[in-house]
Amino acid sequence: MTDRGDFAGQAALFTQDVVYDVSALGGGRLVGLATIREAALTLGDANPVAHHVTNIVLRETADGRVHAVSKGLGVMADGSTGSVTYEDTVERTPAGWRITHRVVRPRRTPLRD
């Protein structure tokens, strides 16, 4: 959805008041779908041309929410790539399951002993 600019479609993934924390990428905490849209449009050509999400692990919490951890791969227009970890809180809403909180953490250091 994001890659093709379908910002209205993001309501199928996120709550209207989602907290989208991209502080580790220098973007701060974005609150709400309108703020996420504006941030993406402000980035313009600096946006990835593709986002790929993989290795999704779900864990139900005692309060009925779901904690999701997944890997994200971003492909830039010049072909360079980056890797992040998404840490999501997912809650059941009247519209169905939606992400209420996301933290994006870049992976910049290789695994070492």
Give residue ranges: language-model regions:
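A beta-strand edge to alpha-helix "cap/lid" segment located at domain peripheries
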Residues: L43-D113
